[in-house]
Amino acid sequence: MKIRKSAEDYLEAMLVLQEEHGCIRSIDIAKKLGVTKPSVSYAVKRLRESGYINMEANGPITLAPAGYKIAKRIYERHKALTAFLEKLGVSREQAEEDACKIEHDISHETYVAICDSLNEGREEKLGSYDFE
């Protein structure tokens, strides 16, 4: 099933918040993405109905396995693309912004080539090839 870019953004933000704070709250999602709380409520409802997240009434939000897989793929791409753009001389802020746009549409072949280029001569590898 093809997932929308906005849903990928929400899932990625949730993963980052979970890693940074240990929990996912709607208010934090709104702040991270620069959207309104009603927008978050609508997105959370749709993501829950699609099986990407779990949430009890007034309870914490957690990523379901399907949502985690998508979030991890997008976040890995984001990190690798940011590093690649910085390697090209792009400022960190601009690299982050551009990576956020590219991460959704880049082909697997191009992503692998970027990771291979970044990882040449490195011990700690960037990117993951487990995702298509």
Residue spans of the language-model regions?
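N-terminal helix-turn-helix DNA-binding core of bacterial DNA-binding proteins
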Residues: 2-35
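Alpha-helical residues within the helix-turn-helix
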Residues: 31, 48-49
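Key DNA-contact positions within bacterial/archaeal DNA-binding proteins
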Residues: 38, 93
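Basic, amphipathic "hinge/linker" alpha-helix immediately C-terminal to the N-terminal HTH DNA-binding motif
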Residues: 59-77
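C-terminal regulatory/oligomerization modules of transcriptional regulators
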Residues: 97-132
